[in-house]
Swiss-Prot record:
Positions that bind L-isoleucyl-5'-AMP: 563
UniProt binding sites for Zn(2+): 926, 929, 946, 949
Function text: Catalyzes the attachment of isoleucine to tRNA(Ile). As IleRS can inadvertently accommodate and process structurally similar amino acids such as valine, to avoid such errors it has two additional distinct tRNA(Ile)-dependent editing activities. One activity is designated as 'pretransfer' editing and involves the hydrolysis of activated Val-AMP. The other activity is designated 'posttransfer' editing and involves deacylation of mischarged Val-tRNA(Ile).
Xref: InterPro entries: aa-tRNA-synth_I_CS, aa-tRNA-synth_Ia, Anticodon_Ile_BEm, Ile-tRNA-ligase, Ile-tRNA-ligase_type1, Ile-tRNA_ligase, M/V/L/I-tRNA-synth_anticd-bd, Rossmann-like_a/b/a_fold
UniProt KW keywords: Aminoacyl-tRNA synthetase, ATP-binding, Cytoplasm, Ligase, Metal-binding, Nucleotide-binding, Protein biosynthesis, Zinc
Gene (name only): ileS
Organism for this UniProt entry: Cyanothece sp. (strain PCC 7425 / ATCC 29141)
Cofactor binding mode and count: Binds 1 zinc ion per subunit.
EC number(s) given by UniProt: 6.1.1.5
Gene Ontology BP term (one): isoleucyl-tRNA aminoacylation
GO cellular component: cytoplasm
PANTHER family per UniProt: ISOLEUCINE--TRNA LIGASE, MITOCHONDRIAL (PTHR42765:SF1), SOLEUCYL-TRNA SYNTHETASE (PTHR42765)
Protein name: Isoleucine--tRNA ligase
Amino acid sequence: MTEPGSYKETVNLPQTAFDMRANAVKREPELQKFWAENQIYENLSQENPGDPFILHDGPPYANGDLHIGHALNKILKDIINKYWMLQGRKVRYVPGWDCHGLPIELKVLQGMKSEQRAALTPLSLRQAAKEFALQTVERQKQSFKRYGVWGEWDNPYLTLKPEYEAAQIGVFGQMVLKGYIYRGLKPVYWSPSSQTALAEAELEYPEGHTSRSIYVSFALTSLSATAEAVLKDYLPNLKVAIWTTTPWTIPGNLAVALNPDLTYAVVEKDGSYLLVANELVERLETTLGVSLPIKTTIAGQALEHSTYQHPLFDRQGPLVMGDYVTTDSGTGLVHTAPGHGQEDYVVGQHYGLPILSPVDGNGRFTEEAGQFAGLKVLDEGNEAVIQALQQVGALLKEEAYSHKYPYDWRTKKPVILRATEQWFASVEGFREAALQAIAQVQWIPAQGENRITAMVSERSDWCISRQRNWGVPIPVFYDEETGEPLLNAETIAHVQAIVAEKGSDAWWELSIEELLPQAYRNNGRRYRKGTDTMDVWFDSGSSWAAVLEQREQLRYPAEMYLEGSDQHRGWFQSSLLTSVATHGIAPYKTVLTHGFVLDEQGRKMSKSLGNVVDPAIVIEGGKNQKEDPPYGADILRLWVSSVDYSSDVPLGKNILKQMADIYRKIRNTARFLLGNLHDFDPANNKVEYDRLPQLDRYMLHRIVEVFTEVNEAFTSYQFFRFFQTVQNFCVVDLSNFYLDIAKDRLYISAPDDFRRRSCQTVLWIALENLAKAIAPVVPHLAEDIWQFLPYPTPYKSVFEAGWVSLDATWTNPDPQLLETFEQVRLLRFKVNECLEKLRVNKVIGASLEAKVLLYIADPEKRQQWQNLNPPALAAISGVDELRYFFLTSQVELLNSPDQLSELKSEYRFEFGDSSGGVLPADGQKCDRCWNYSTYVGKDDKHLLLCERCVAVMER
């Protein structure tokens, strides 16, 4: 054969049907169907030999479509579940949904015409809310499945199912019997816009809230015995000065609180005297715009039990002590309304003050507020109180004050604190046990422990009652005559059994007689049933009892709870409180939290900014597919693995493009590996470790390092380490180094040559371990790779094959070997820089048109390098040769650096005390392998071939 190109057919080019493109929109659903039909999740969750691993799902709210935060959350959970499944553990994941509560009720009401609303009964509203919730669950479920998330999708837990509601009533009952549930008139967060009490978890604190703050004086009417001696000369012109950001609470004022440890000053103003904190005098002079000369000072403690006159009502109130009073703002004296504040309530109880809350459920003043009755407290009520104080000369100053103020998380309207009859869980009763339980849990990241500890330490009792219809009823009856609640083991167990059978609708459907146990029917008393439902945080907070304790093969406590960092205040806490109150332990062993998803500039996502990333559009593509290409689920999942989820994480179009590029690199690497294994069967063709060339042993050492790091990334839940390591392995170790060098062995050798089979052995190990290692994160790609393995395998799915398998013998190679290849890689970099200059200057085209000259100063090292540079004809099956490592046709080791001086300086390089250079290769180009050789043209039969290729052709 003497025609150029005649040897094309003799080269072993890659062969695989594995697609270069993911075509995710079509291929991912096919792979999901394959998993479903073969019941991969079901089989492994039951048949894996290891211990169970139970990650308990925090239920998303069945209200609307999924957003990118849902995707981040569910994908993180799935990565962890799939990893432990590959590790052989029995992973059972039961997804859940939170189905009750005001937001769903509001959605249903918003979708109705006014005449439909007017005709609503509690039961018809509940039916509509249930239908809405179930439709939403179905829609969200399909989206979650499309993300590639595995779980018990045919049997999820829903907080509206009878068995769940019954278990929840059981938790409530246990807390009642332990004395932790009580009814009381207490200030609670009340939403006038929703007309219900709210838990702290249902509040948000938007930026930019401004209140009307006022400084007010109350005239002192009597002094305590301890204050008399110091202050009697200043009466009757002595007043206390208070500051408040809620003028509407002044009608509820019953006391003024001081800090017993602060010093207070009497200052002169306009011919009368004000009592204020001594260290705030200067600041108040600036605020009020007047000089306030100090007349005398007195200890806060000495003022206890002095009295003052309310400026707007005919009543007097005491000065009381509160260590929560600070000098951060205001006057150092705090207006106290026990019906409108938590600290006010506590101090009021201590001093035996009544609870006055002259505000109704609509947020309007009641008759108790006298002249203000009927006014909306947050609007005209505020204004009217300020005007009234002005008229009686009690207003010292009004100014705008920007601060964090609670809003209803659903209606986005401000809330108020208002005393109402509510049901509470007494956190005080088990706070210490809860704090001890927190300390037993592993928190990831660690600062989560401090957050939830502070919250539980400081939290007030939990208001668990809601004045709405769509929820689980508080199973209480009230005596018609006395109003006394009837709530005991017998009544709770009876209602629980009914709910287990008929669902919580029974509370509205059945008569009082049917809901009461036999002993309480016809006993001479008349009862009415309560109308309150439970806080939805009590619903989801009971999931450990309704799911973990009830279902076979689940475990309580769970291995892990995983949600957004806002759940320290929400689900983590409500679950902890119910579990500790009833069992004395936390319901979880580990709690992992993630941040929120922001845009690429670090801003919150909002429709108004146009920066919302919709996971459905990321996966399926948008209307304009150029603008919003269909990336598929794996690229979304790859993004999840790339971020440090312990704080807020960015996402946008540029980041998605980067992810697609990285995904493509991993996919193309896998495709190259598959293509070059088309004629390899490990059962027959693999080469044993001790026969492998040095390069291959070095590569196996790198494989051990890489996959050990990947494993540590998964066990420590630091998935960004996985992302960086796998990306680096595919690009730097494989594509740019090993596979670059391997092409010559793979394509040019005879199919069954040792140098080719040894390389394929490494490719096989790299490919299978790569597929297994990426399976938790990009399961569709991993499965796709596995389905295209060109040799028989006993495992029909990558997930059945288990986790990466690394042989201990690969881990301890000769240190000399490692040092040599670290040097080779550094030297390659230097050589490539010079080759690029030759290319730019059109001296050469491909690197095989070049020859490398090396001068090694150290004689010992020179001998080592000489061993890697045999004469051309000596190593027909060579692998460990410098020319292959550098992808050049020849390498010459020089005896003196002087021989480099003839080269242009730009074609020379230094490394350490050695040096080298690059110049065009000797000889002619071989038509088969494209290496240059002085042998080309010397073989009569194969004039166009080099000595290596002639040897292959003559076999």
